[in-house]
């Protein structure tokens, strides 16, 4: 369908974002914080998707989100969830995690008794790209998370910290989203952890941002609620600068 575009428009009405980090940095909590903030801002329906194998929803128990989550265990479950989500007019959707989702794709396409052969990665990448890009059609705000790993970029041969996805998806998944950020967590004491997200271009970490003027500073993520507000605020400020 053809439609006109205003290329001068500066808006964050639609966001598709991937955040990756080491385990235990607070990714799942950030997804819950986003859903709570968007629920309060828009008063519309939101959805948390727990992909079997992650199961970190206990970290969200104090947020008061209620019955807005769903677990998918197979690729068929995922497709049914997407079909239902198209009818619901979701304002925001969070997916935990992309690594678990690619396992569902691999199980569906090649089985579970062996790793993929080299010739099979093509279909896995194609399916994952389609699943990820379709998420944009489900809600105004999409936040996916994924653990990080070190990977060799197949284009330039350099080693990066990337989302922990197979083959060329590790670096290529950045093309599926408007924003790709890396969440850092530094433990100062058993009771004190400082967190920050970077979207700035980095020679050793996969990041991305579709902004006319890039965010070049780390975004501090407060303990508890307020992380999504900090991210959204930084994006809005960059758009208006």
Tell where the protein language model's regions lie, with residue ranges:
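A generic structural signal for well-ordered alpha-helical segments
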Residues: 35, 85, 135, 173-174
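Phosphate-binding/switch region of NTP-binding enzymes
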Residues: 142-218
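Single-residue recognition of alpha-helix boundary sites
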Residues: 38, 107-108, 189
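Conserved P-loop
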Residues: 2-88, 92-95, 99-104
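P-loop NTPase motor core
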Residues: 92-172
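C-terminal regions of RecA-like/P-loop NTPase motor modules
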Residues: 1-2, 11-12, 190-241
């Amino acid at each position: 369908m053809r439609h006109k575009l205003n290329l001068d428009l500066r808006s964050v009405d639609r966001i598709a974002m991937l955040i990756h980090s080491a385990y235990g940095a607070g990714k799942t909590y950030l997804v819950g914080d986003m859903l709570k903030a968007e629920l309060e801002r828009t008063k519309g329906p939101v959805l948390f998707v727990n992909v079997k194998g992650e199961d970190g929803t206990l970290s969200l128990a104090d947020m008061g989100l209620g019955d807005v989550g769903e677990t998918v265990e197979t690729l068929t479950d995922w497709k049914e969830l997407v079909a239902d989500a198209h009818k619901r007019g979701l304002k925001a959707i969070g997916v935990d995690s992309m690594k678990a989702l690619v396992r569902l794709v691999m199980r569906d396409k090649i089985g579970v008794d062996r790793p993929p052969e080299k010739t099979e990665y093509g279909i896995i990448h194609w399916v994952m790209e389609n699943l990820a890009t379709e998420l944009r059609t489900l809600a105004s705000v999409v936040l996916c998370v994924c653990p990080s790993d070190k990977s060799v970029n197949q284009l330039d041969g350099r080693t990066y910290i990337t989302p922990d996805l197979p083959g060329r998806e590790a670096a290529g998944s950045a093309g599926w989203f408007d924003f790709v950020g890396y969440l850092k967590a530094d433990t100062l004491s058993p009771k004190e952890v400082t967190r920050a997200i970077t979207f700035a271009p980095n020679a050793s970490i996969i990041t991305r941002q579709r902004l006319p003027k890039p965010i070049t500073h780390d975004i501090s993520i407060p303990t508890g609620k307020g992380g999504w507000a900090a991210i959204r605020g930084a994006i809005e400020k960059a758009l208006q600068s």
